[in-house]
Amino acid sequence: MFIDKARIFVKAGNGGNGSVAFRREKYVPAGGPDGGDGGRGASIIFEVDLGLRTLMDFKYQKKYQAQNGGDGSKGKRAGKNGENLVLKVPAGTVIRDEATGLVLADLKKEGDTAIVAKGGIGGKGNQHFANAVRQAPAFAKSGTDGEERWITLELKMIADVGLLGFPNVGKSTFLSVVTKAKPKIANYHFTTLTPNLGVVQTKFGDSFVLADIPGIIEGASEGIGLGHEFLRHVERTKVLIHIVDISGLEGRDPIEDFDKINDELKLYNEKLSKRPQVVVANKFDILEDESKFEKFKSELEGRGYTVFKMSAATRQGIDEVIAYVSKMLKEVEDVELVSEEEMYRPELDIGTEEELSIDIEDGVYVVTGKALRRIMYSVNFDDMESLQYFQKAMESQGVFDRLREMGIEDGDVVKIYELEFEFYN
């Protein structure tokens, strides 16, 4: 089964927690803190595998969770780092963040990789918080949470040239003649149900990749026929070969066919509709009135297109088409599928990591924030030094300033997750 789109959830591993421990050895009555650091959480990485052709692996498994980092322990022993989860995808896979619509990665060639969810950082053990005044800190830092997000995967095949045209105009026959590809060929509409790729070797030693997609019909943009879903597989192409049936045996007008296909192309993607097109009038060998071709050629050349006559079945005119397209490819610039504006930029992502929220519920000031929660869960509130550390963290996070701005008064109740206390300046 050919699967070219998938929606999955990815969750990187959390960082391990730092340890609160003290050195305990015979003859060493006051060994000091020796809690180790937490391990790094595993990240989720996507990598190109040239052996893959579809996104089938993501059809049935929708959620992926990477390993958490191990907690630190006594003796300054660090927790184990999580092992990164590497997911393989075909070349041409575009990964998009569902929440923002931004592109996280466009994986185009062998060796391309992308981290789409970073693992959390391990927390520091209590050994790091000892100083001349605080010699036995009874607290450590918790590990940070790993990133999580819903993402969409879209396979947009890597091809230099794409074939366009109505069903049954001879695209698959053309592909089979000029490449070693073996697409299904029959005399009925929608014989091709999945995209096909083939490599064209020219007589001059050049080569290029040719993509044949299922035929498009009028109304494809509204879901008629096979819809326009497969058009994504010609988005990367530099040149389009637009094949029409010039024979008229099915009673169609080749100029109308040409215009209808381009109308659907424009509805799907304005940029794609402006891609250079070479027009090929196929089935010329069974055309009874050659003046029909001359009329077609005159009309299209008047619009600025280059027009060839061809018979894919008898191979007449094929060499001329291939030579011309090969020459065009050297003159046309590569296609940048994803613009800079569409790309995700981590440095601009403020995210929710350090966001602080304070709401008043039934007279209680409810404070939430990921950073604050991590600090709170790492503190021993029965220990005065730990409590002082937490108060300083609250101050540095701007909690007290925000509470004062909201009009808090002495004796008002503040709730931070499971912790409740009365506020006093």
Curated annotation (Swiss-Prot):
Organism of derivation: Clostridioides difficile (strain 630) (Peptoclostridium difficile)
Short name of any one Pfam family annotated for the protein: GTP1_OBG
Domain OBG-type G: 159-330
Complexes and interactors: Monomer.
Top-level lineage group: Bacteria
Gene name linked to the record: obg
All residue ranges annotated as the Obg domain in the record: 1-158
Keyword annotations of the record: Cytoplasm, GTP-binding, Hydrolase, Magnesium, Metal-binding, Nucleotide-binding
UniProt-listed NCBIfam families: Obg_CgtA, Obg_CgtA_exten, PRK12296.1, PRK12297.1, PRK12299.1
Name of this protein: GTPase Obg
